[in-house]
């Protein structure tokens, strides 16, 4: 699995530049954006959502049911009654 470092090395830019391009932030020339996007495509880089959530101090619930199906629910995405269902699912799998 490709890392941010791999993309930066291939594009010939810093990791922070790669991050700015991926997050669509300002201050990056169009030619540099194209190099980074090409490197992302070549490497098959996929941003790590869990790492991003940790940096943003966001949280989620990750549950695997008895069949092996994984449920990933981001904080704020559920109503109170749905949270109760997720908690019940967790209890059933303990």
UniProtKB/Swiss-Prot annotation:
UniProt xrefs under InterPro entries: HTH_LacI, Lambda_DNA-bd_dom_sf, YtfJ_HI0045
Segments forming domain HTH lacI-type = 1-56
Q: What is this protein called?
A: Sucrose operon repressor
Bilayer-crossing regions: none
Record CDD domains: HTH_LacI
UniProt-recorded Gene Ontology molecular function terms: DNA-binding transcription factor activity; transcription cis-regulatory region binding
Does the keyword section mention Iron? no
**Where does the signal sequence lie?**
none
User: Which SMART domains does this entry report, sorted A to Z?
Assistant: HTH_LACI
What's its job? Repressor for the scr operon. Binds D-fructose as an inducer.
Q: Annotated DNA-binding ranges?
A: 4-23
Q: Which UniProt keywords apply?
A: DNA-binding, Repressor, Transcription, Transcription regulation
Query: Record's Pfam families?
Result: LacI, YtfJ_HI0045
């Amino acid at each position: 699995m490709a890392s941010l470092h791999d993309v930066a090395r291939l594009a010939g830019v810093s990791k922070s530049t790669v991050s700015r391009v991926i997050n669509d932030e300002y201050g990056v020339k169009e030619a540099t954006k194209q190099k980074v996007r090409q490197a992302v495509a070549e490497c098959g880089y996929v941003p790590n959502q869990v790492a991003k959530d940790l940096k943003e101090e966001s949280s989620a619930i990750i549950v695997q049911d008895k069949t092996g199906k994984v449920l990933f629910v981001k904080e704020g995405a559920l109503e109170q009654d749905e949270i109760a269902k997720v908690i019940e699912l967790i209890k059933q799998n303990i």
